[in-house]
Amino acid sequence: MPKTVANTKPMDVLKNALSRNVLIDVKGNREYSGILEGYDVYMNVVLQNASEIINGENKGVFDRILVRGDNVIFVSPSKGDNE
């Protein structure tokens, strides 16, 4: 039986996105796109092979990056990765 939005918890979304591509929007018109390696209850997230995007322009690639949770606006699993 498919889950409905009403019974989906935020941490479940992150758990299901582990080892998958995600897009993270953060304060300051920045985004990070990469493979979700880990997270905690404070929304601190670790990405592998992460691209930093500022104002729509790719500014660099990181092997591994930690994004501090208090800067996170949203986390979105990439299309096709939302099972």
From Swiss-Prot:
InterPro entries: Lsm6/sSmF (IPR016487), LSM_dom_sf (IPR010920), Sm (IPR047575), Sm_dom_euk/arc (IPR001163), snRNP_Sm-like_arc (IPR022901). GO terms for cellular component: ribonucleoprotein complex; Sm-like protein family complex. It holds the Pfam family LSM. One of its GO terms (biological process) is mRNA splicing, via spliceosome. GO terms for molecular function: RNA binding. Keywords: Ribonucleoprotein. Residues 9-81 form the Sm domain. Belongs to the snRNP Sm proteins family. HAMAP family: Lsm_RuxX (MF_00257). NCBIfam families: PRK00737.1 (NF001963). This is Putative snRNP Sm-like protein. It comes from Thermoplasma volcanium (strain ATCC 51530 / DSM 4299 / JCM 9571 / NBRC 15438 / GSS1).
